[in-house]
Amino acid sequence: FSVMPLSLGSFRIGIHIAAPALGIEPESALDKIAAARLSTVYLPGNKITMLPDSIIHHFTLTENRLQPALSLYLDVSDDFTVIKCESRIEKIRVATNLRNNSLEQHFNDLALNKGGFEHTYSNELSLLWKFACKMEAQRGKSNDNNDKIDYSFEIKDDRVTISERRRGSPIDKVVSELMIYVNTEWGKQLTEAGITGIFRSQANGKVKMSTSPAPHQGLGVSQYTWSSSPMRRYVDLINQRQIIALLRKEA
């Protein structure tokens, strides 16, 4: 993510997604590998990636590297209302990759309840947090995973270490809400342009995938595409191609 101050207390949020669709052609050898695997599989202490490691390294938004990205920019007023959206295909240079385990030492509920925290990006993180809270309230939905616990497994010298992490931290909410926003907005753009996408919807507790947009009751949005994880889900890679075609006026 990026945050840029604008005039009169407003600011611009950038949601930047790695863009492997710019380099993986449909029906190419790499595309066939991704299509066969469909998604990354996560196992205790290991994972089987959808794409080869060399391709992941090539397209990952790593700090201090100029990388291709599909970005959504939101111009946000001082009351955290979105007043403008713009999608771009671009190259970006990431200043810093922030990691959850180190970030949560500073950016947590306790620090926010005290009114602030010390971090190089404390101002940007605080703005993103307030924006995420506003977006969650607008959807009329809260994160149902707050009380769930994730476990990570590490194997070293034949010894297994299990660590637990409770979901629902401030950084979880920021990432979740901005991903919901970008997937909803890109789904809206595809719908308005009459371009086919793969949509995820929910009604009466049943979730389905379809090429026709429909409301997602669980998230409280009018339409929702999977498009924010094109490195680990094939559906997202397909949708990213459609969004790129829309922006390039190729569809």
PLM regions with names:
Residues F1-A251:
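Electropositive polyanion-binding surfaces
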